[in-house]
């Protein structure tokens, strides 16, 4: 994080006007909350659970993919979708229990904001969950945009999601 802090000092306001961040694995370590939600979900459906460390390799490409990876081999798509739906609902209510802010992130965000740089965050989490997480971990950071899955905007990694944010 020291490297980023030093780089940040090199930018003046004319050079950098906005900074857009991903959430999971960038601003926050969410593996333990996501893994716990997945394990609760798997147990609810009678499937075996995984060590939380295993979820590091399951996360990425959205919740449906997480549950495809976590479910036993051969699990049908309808069941995977049911796992995703149950897990999403559970996670929405338990998304701030074990998540941790990465070292240096608050200082970086406050430093950028102090320089007048507009801050944004884009995630594939539902918009309601994204806003809840951001309000919990970064209540003092003036994010101009907190964009999650609202059912309308394209999801990451579609380049349109970033382009839409830039247009705002």
Annotate each predicted stretch with a short phrase.
Residues 97-100, 126-168:
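Substrate-recognition "cap/lid" segment bordering the active-site pocket of phosphatases
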Residues 3-4, 12-107, 115, 128, ...:
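N-terminal helical cap/lid subdomain that shapes the substrate entry/recognition surface
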Residues 116-120:
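Short active-site oxyanion
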Residues 58, 122-124, 149:
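Structural motif
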């Amino acid at each position: 994080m020291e490297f980023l802090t030093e780089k940040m000092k090199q930018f003046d306001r004319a050079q950098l006007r906005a900074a857009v961040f991903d959430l999971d694995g960038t601003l926050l370590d969410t593996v333990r909350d996501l893994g716990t939600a997945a394990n609760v979900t798997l147990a609810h459906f009678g499937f075996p659970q995984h060590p939380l460390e295993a979820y590091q390799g399951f996360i990425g490409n959205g919740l449906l993919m997480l549950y495809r990876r976590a479910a036993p081999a051969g699990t049908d798509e309808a069941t995977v979708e049911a796992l995703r739906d149950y897990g999403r609902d559970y996670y929405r209510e338990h998304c701030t229990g074990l998540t941790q802010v990465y070292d240096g992130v608050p200082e970086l965000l406050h430093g950028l904001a102090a320089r007048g740089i507009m801050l944004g965050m884009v995630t594939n989490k539902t918009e309601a969950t994204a806003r809840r997480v951001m309000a919990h971990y970064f209540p003092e950071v003036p994010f101009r945009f907190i964009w999650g899955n609202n059912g309308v905007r394209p999801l990451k990694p579609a380049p349109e999601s970033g382009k839409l944010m830039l247009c705002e």
